[in-house]
């Protein structure tokens, strides 16, 4: 509701927020330290308004290597498009962490059952090899 209200109040085409990171058991670790409206917004914390709908095809058409970094790819296209963006400096999503990387960043013990950290770096290298600007 907060994102939708912000979209209306700010007359924005796209609104984003941060996320609250949770352990596999659902208990809260805290706010995501990675959220930066210029560099990284998790897909779960993105709200596309009608003015940003024409960009949604980028999700479908991104190269296979891009899916691992799809949230950054979409943020790139949003920024390039010039649509009016607004970021709420608050958490709107509870994100259950199933990959080990976020546990390390939160100084948490890595629990059993989480996936190893994916090779994001390989995707960034492929993106840049295609002549696109760095997303890191």
Language-model regions: role of each:
Residues 1-136:
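Nucleotide-sugar donor-binding/catalytic module of glycosyltransferases
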């Amino acid at each position: 509701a907060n994102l939708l209200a912000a979209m209306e109040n700010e007359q924005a085409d796209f609104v984003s927020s941060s996320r609250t990171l949770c352990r596999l058991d659902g208990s809260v670790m805290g706010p995501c330290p990675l959220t930066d409206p210029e560099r990284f917004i998790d897909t779960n914390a993105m709200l596309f308004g009608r003015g940003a709908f024409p960009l949604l095809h980028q999700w479908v058409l991104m190269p296979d290597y891009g899916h691992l970094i799809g949230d950054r790819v979409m943020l790139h296209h949003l920024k390039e498009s010039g649509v009016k963006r607004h970021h709420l400096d608050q958490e709107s999503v509870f994100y259950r962490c199933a990959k080990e990387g976020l546990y390390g960043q939160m100084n948490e013990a890595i629990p059993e059952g989480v996936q190893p950290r994916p090779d994001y770096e390989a995707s960034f290298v492929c993106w840049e090899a295609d002549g696109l600007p760095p997303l890191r």
